[in-house]
């Protein structure tokens, strides 16, 4: 009985993945160095990348969010839910 209970606890922990935090890119370039990553805060389950053109060229903003941010017209956005997907 104790073995069964212990097995259930282990399986539950593995399925819930307790303590997991999403990791998103935070750089503002087309490609990001591997050290430009951030562990998102609790409740932030989305990585996003917004990008738009200016007179100075392409602008990019990346980060973590609880929901996919709303953007102004002319700004493109990509939202995703896996590590380093932005």
From Swiss-Prot:
It comes from Micrurus corallinus (Brazilian coral snake). Binds and inhibits muscular and neuronal nicotinic acetylcholine receptors (nAChR). Its main location: secreted. Residues 1-21 form the signal peptide. It comes from the Eukaryota. Disulfide bonds join 24-47, 27-32, 40-64, 68-79, 80-85. Belongs to the three-finger toxin family. Ancestral subfamily. Orphan group IV sub-subfamily. One of its GO terms (molecular function) is acetylcholine receptor inhibitor activity. Gene3D superfamilies: CD59. Keywords: Acetylcholine receptor inhibiting toxin, Disulfide bond, Ion channel impairing toxin, Neurotoxin, Postsynaptic neurotoxin, Secreted, Signal, Toxin. InterPro entries: Snake_3FTx (IPR003571), Snake_toxin-like_sf (IPR045860), Snake_toxin_con_site (IPR018354), Toxin_cobra-type (IPR054131). CDD domains: TFP_snake_toxin. GO terms for cellular component: extracellular region. This is Alpha-neurotoxin homolog 8. It holds the Pfam family Toxin_cobra-type.
């Amino acid at each position: 009985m104790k073995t069964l209970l212990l097995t259930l606890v282990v399986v539950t922990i593995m399925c819930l993945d307790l303590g997991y935090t999403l990791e998103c890119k935070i750089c503002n370039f087309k490609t990001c160095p591997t050290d430009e990553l951030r562990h998102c805060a609790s409740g932030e389950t989305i990585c996003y990348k917004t990008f738009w053109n200016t007179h100075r060229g392409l602008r990019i903003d990346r980060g973590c969010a609880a929901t996919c941010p709303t953007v102004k017209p002319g700004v493109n956005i990509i939202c995703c839910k896996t590590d380093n997907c932005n």
